[in-house]
């Protein structure tokens, strides 16, 4: 019977010493095995993922690129008859095991380290009980330079809960509750969680309006904020309704984050056109990033969007998107309208020859 698997060398060495000191040489066998070791412990844990007891990838890059990383086991093949006896004249075939290949990530360790450090500080200082995430992306090629979720977990101890409140009552939890707690800890918020983007989404409304020729950036006095706007009988306030922004250009309206101006632009665009831009920016589908567990945005069906719904969408409310969708949108604008597919792996290294195979960036629009 197997008592324990994948134990740390330090623990096994202590057991060996105890067996020797107590002259205990029967009944207990120690078989050497290998397992994945992560030298940086918590670093980029939600990106890298980890392996199970059978060395199969269970999350992150480990799961997505499991076949490339795993290699193939060696084996011996023999030809036998129906009774299981080897057939005379046949030859055994020995097929050697092959190591898995290495992968080259897009992550910049310096940027990742800085992001993780300040994300942790921000979450602690602001008492973010649900944690947080940060994504840094190169707009020109889709390379993810950093992707951090807080809190992190130790890749060498992936079943060790980091939430003190949960760990204190761990023994009292049901199997279902334990699994849910672990899944929550492993969850990469940057790709799997959705949120309401708010005023940051005004970039989409601005881009669509400019592209359609409805407005221009610096037409002084083109817009006027009176503190609110009425759409289909519903009054929607500007955040600064108590002291309206007054006369503005588009650039100024964006700087002021003036809701009524973007509501008006959304009405001029109309539902069909606005949703076509949601599609072009990639909000109605997953980005296709090379990680498992990606979610997609949550929007009202186009047929159910009336003037009021379109008004709230125009300034970033009543729908949800993922962080990776948002940074893909911003990167598309920065890249002059070319939407690059976000990626975390840019190549592989052949374990035998050392040859590098580079993956080309993919433009999805």
Segments the model singles out, each with a brief description of its role:
Residues 1-100:
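Small/polar-residue-rich segments within soluble enzyme cores
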Residues 3, 88-132:
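Conserved, well-ordered alpha-helix/loop/beta-strand core segments that scaffold catalytic motifs
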Residues 24-29, 124-139:
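Short N-terminal helix-loop-first-beta-strand/juxtamembrane motif that initiates sensory/input modules
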Residues 73, 127-131, 195, 223:
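Short, small/polar residue-rich loop motifs at catalytic or cofactor-binding pockets
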Residues 81-92, 140-200, 204-365:
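Beta-lactam-recognizing serine transpeptidase/beta-lactamase-like catalytic domain environment
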Residues 115, 134-145:
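Short, glycine-anchored, charge-dense loop/turn motifs used at functional sites
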